[in-house]
Swiss-Prot record:
Record text on cofactor binding: Binds 1 zinc ion per subunit.
Gene (name only): rpl37e
Annotated zinc fingers (C4-type), start-end: 20-38
Annotated Zn(2+) binding sites: C20, C23, C35, C38
One cellular component (GO) term of this entry: cytosolic large ribosomal subunit
Required co-factors: Zn(2+)
Entry protein name: Large ribosomal subunit protein eL37
Single Gene Ontology MF annotation: zinc ion binding
Annotated keywords: Metal-binding, Ribonucleoprotein, Ribosomal protein, RNA-binding, rRNA-binding, Zinc, Zinc-finger
Signal peptide extent: none
Length: 62
């Protein structure tokens, strides 16, 4: 096994985020056990911010 820069490229396999059960987005962090989009796993309340979604026709979109 070699170490150094060539072996650092092998760290990009796999993904930390899977599909969230609550919001359906690919934002559920497997190791943290929390969704970065809706807050599932970390909070009972839905994680929402005004800056997170752009207004279209006066309505917020997901």
């Amino acid at each position: 096994m070699s170490k150094g820069t060539p072996s650092q490229g092998k760290h990009n396999k796999g993904s930390n985020h899977i599909i969230c059960r609550r919001c359906g987005r690919r934002s559920y962090h497997v190791r943290k056990k929390a969704c970065s989009a809706c807050g599932f796993g970390a909070s009972k309340r839905l994680k929402t911010f005004a800056w997170k979604n752009k207004k279209i026709n006066g309505q917020r979109v997901r």
